Amino acid sequence: MARTHFIFLLLVALLSTTFPSSSSSREQEKDRIKALPGQPKVAFSQYSGYVNVNQSHGRALFYWLTESSSPSPHTKPLLLWLNGGPGCSSIAYGASEEIGPFRINKTGSNLYLNKFAWNKDANLLFLESPAGVGYSYTNTSSDLKDSGDERTAQDNLIFLIKWLSRFPQYKYRDFYIAGESYAGHYVPQLAKKINDYNKAFSKPIINLKGFLVGNAVTDNQYDSIGTVTYWWTHAIISDKSYKSILKYCNFTVERVSDDCDNAVNYAMNHEFGDIDQYSIYTPTCVAAQQKKNTTGFFVRMKNTLLRRRLVSGYDPCTESYAEKYFNRPDVQRAMHANVTGIRYKWTACSDVLIKTWKDSDKTMLPIYKELAASGLRIWIFSGDTDSVVPVTATRFSLSHLNLPVKTRWYPWYTDNQVGGWTEVYKGLTFATVRGAGHEVPLFEPKRALILFRSFLAGKELPRSY
């Protein structure tokens, strides 16, 4: 029944793209951002607004498009960026801290340019998804308590189809998806939806070429084993805690036992210390401890250890700058946001969605196998100082794909220094970024940009100085 309803929604969305009207140009122009408050002068165009993905429930997703700053943006691909959580904003993180053209100052009063913005090479589309994240909303309150992987992927596909109707110049354009963390679910799940959808057309409007994901949640069992191993090998936890967690935690089941819960809680509360778990070698922010206490970082979730680790919060300092800026009424007017007068404040992550997330696939490995065989370009990258979804977790998970190696492990270089390490498999490339935390473009922006350019070009990462 649910599948039939989804197919019906796709047909409705498809009809709106098959018979474009003059209203598309009017809708597009209505979404144009003339200038953001405190924004430096730029030559590229920006648009933002809402796309309704479910009329009966009143679910609408908010987007922000920053076109390429290159002299010929019409020749550049379109990149959709998704952040994870689940329940965290791509505008708060991807756009404002990582790959977007602007950074927010500490007071939330002004913007300044990001020297390593990815819109030098692509048109960037940031989507706040699912409904309930950031400015995205639903008129059906129960939607906030039964969100999950499947509906998020469905809504994101419907968004894309309808958005392309509003922006027909992007139909058939080379299209890529990127993201990080729990977007390790969102990105491949959406890629599969698009791949399946495109099979019905000889020339599909969504010209999906590939995707890349950083510090990606991939497989509950292997990710969890790899994470605990990272904690121990990086001297964050004791031998005793490491052995206790491996002894008492069964990472193949949905619910953790009390013994497992106690072992993990002891390690995190008594051995970790006050470190930034998303970047273990960088200083913590004063606000970090406050964030930990107020968001329930250590609350017991209903799922696995993995879910317990994913309660929100990247860098709490930069996150607070975004919350100051995007709650400003003049910013919301400029972005055509909060047009329905949402009663709650814009936040970087939704606690409600995080705590009530319903369906979460245990593994992405079957999707990776399918899409790797389909010819899509797939890159997985890991910042190597992240202890939340660490490099060992990703390597443990990817090793179970058993893909043939095309290019053996080697160091790649930037500015006469090792930028990380990489190995190329048949259908998939894996790369590390040296010195980067959970949000790779935040901690190592230049290396992240070089990685992105190599991905777009379909070339291996540079071997030379």
From Swiss-Prot:
Question: How is expression of this protein distributed across tissues?
Answer: Expressed in shoots, leaves, cauline leaves, siliques and flowers. Expressed a low levels in roots and stems.
Q: Does the keyword DNA repair apply?
A: no
Listed under catalytic activity are: Preferential release of a C-terminal arginine or lysine residue
Tell me the first and last residues of the signal peptide.
1-24
**pH relationship of activity:** Optimum pH is 5.5.
Q: What is its EC number?
A: 3.4.16.6
Cellular location of this protein?
Answer: Secreted, Extracellular space
Subunit relationships: Heterodimer.
Biological function: Active serine carboxypeptidase with broad substrate preference, including basic and hydrophilic groups. Processes a protein involved in an early event in the brassinosteroid signaling pathway.
Q: What is this protein called?
A: Serine carboxypeptidase 24
